[in-house]
Amino acid sequence: MIEKLRNLDNKFVDKNIPYVTISAVNGYISPKFDQEAIAKKCEEKGKTINCKWTGLTYKEILDLWEQKANVSRTYGKKLDAYTECKLEGDENSIEEFMLDNDVDTDERMKAHIKAFDQFYERIMKSGDVEFVGREIEVWNRITINDNDFYVKGRLDALFYNKRTDTWIIIDWKSNECISTKGNKWTPTLLGPAQSLPNLDWYTYTMQVFNYKEALLQNYLPEGTEASHVQCMIVNLPKAEYENTDAILGKNKGEIYKAYMPAFKYDENFLNRVFEFAYKKDKLERSMRKLKEKEESETKVEKQEEFDLF
């Protein structure tokens, strides 16, 4: 099926046109998270009640969070490597991966792998679905009002159902969980997306919809309709739990969780969100340049003062 795709070399991309990444888009539409302020609150909480923060300073709490993030990034890279071996059907590479990463003694990695294998077996079970490609870099050109820019991204995996003539975009996650339900304290997203809650499910949906828009615009066979492109967010958790709401079924023992998009695909809405993020990115770049210029001028002034003596 990969031969049916077009423009995979991305030679059509005009390097003179600016771009913003889809990760940056999600960053700009999400309320700022002040880690230091939250860590200080955790420190104060630890002083008043006996909890996991008791005896820790806010700097130690920040260090713990950074260590946890680094570990998650490491496992994310390992999972990417395993999925590549599995999707490419290279049994020797799979065996080598298992040995090199000592998977037999790593319960977390075993859980990630089990979740992926279960999902892969489930989606391929009918015999109608074919693996198309992975780590596909896509460029989505947006022209709205007086702005012309790209939203750049890299989709995790693409499948094709030959019976239904449907393309399936997959975005892998390896979170402990994906937040789908908020409460009265849950903040909203920003800009044109402020009608949506600040939850993983919604920002991940923004991500896969960008891939969908890009594929329809530049990569899938011409004439492909939006209804023939399905998006799925699949969580491959680090610990086992029984899946109760998987899209592909509710079989006991399944530990992956598959989510359909949180809201309907609306190209006009998406482009407004992307334009907002592009403007924010442009503004931040201008502010950084101005700050760098001011710092440079300050250094020159200090040097001139020094030269006087």
List each model region and its residues.
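Nuclease catalytic cores
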Residues: 1-141, 148
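Short histidine-centered catalytic/ligand-binding loop motif
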Residues: 68, 101-104, 189-202
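Conserved catalytic cores of phosphodiester-cleaving nucleases, focusing on short active-site segments
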Residues: 80, 153-161, 166-191, 211
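A structural signal for short, well-ordered beta-strand segments and their strand-loop junctions
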Residues: 133, 168-171, 230-235
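Short, solvent-exposed loop/turn segments at secondary-structure junctions
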Residues: 139, 175-177, 238-239
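Short, solvent-exposed loop/turn segments that connect beta-strands within catalytic domains
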Residues: 144-148, 162-166, 220-225
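Short, mixed charged/polar active-site loops
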Residues: 148-152, 165-167, 255-257
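Metal-dependent nuclease catalytic regions and adjoining charged, substrate-binding loops involved
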Residues: 197-205, 209-309
